[in-house]
Amino acid sequence: MKKSAPCTFTSINHQIHYAMSFIGGGVEVISFIFLFKALIGFMTSNLIFGINTFANGKFDYISLYHIGIVVIWMLIAAIHQLCMIKFTNFRKRTPWHGYAISLTINCFLLASFILIGQYMLTSGVLGSLPTPSITPLIIIGLMFMYIQNYLIKSGGTNYPTTTSVVTTVYVLMTTSLVNYLNHNISKSERQASLREGLHYLLVLIHFSAGAYITAKLSSHFGFYSLFLMLFILIAVTMNTWFTHSRFLCSSSDENSNDKAI
């Protein structure tokens, strides 16, 4: 009897991807609602906002706000690359070591984003227009989203996407699902297309669900509505560290057996 293939979507790599998509949807909608339509994970939208403002002849902080977000994002990317070069000899003890470290950093960043954001919201710092005083909050949010996108890009799901939801994801999902109907290819290729299409569909569902739930909660709790996302992130982080530890233990047991022989 032929064994059925294990469900691809239950691997820890996919769990991280879907959790990051859900959390990313929540953070994006909060930034859109409270940070003057700044989508801190989508640089193209900020670039368009900035260009449109400049085209209308406005050259104040408001016009620089969205362009500044793009510039800060590029600086974060540059710093990350410099760190990669500096610590090129860093050896990951397991395949999940880097993910666990990145997720842990993001726990602190998200907690800081929530607390500082709620303080600014209740104290009146977040007024009707953006001011330089909100820059620290923007930087924290951008750092969080950069790591989130990095986790999705390098999360090991073998599907070509760099963020939770970009235009490419919609195209890849649709073409993969439609390709399943192509009987000119083998059954295994059709199944692979179906799995890929369902993966992208799950990414979109998780992102949309996170954004919808957070948008509903935000009218009552403000930035505190992201505590749901923080709890999920902590759970995913702990699970990743546990997986890392189990892998280490199994590796050490194998080494002990080899030495005993």
Region spans (language model):
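Alpha-helical transmembrane segments of multi-pass membrane proteins
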Residues: 2-261
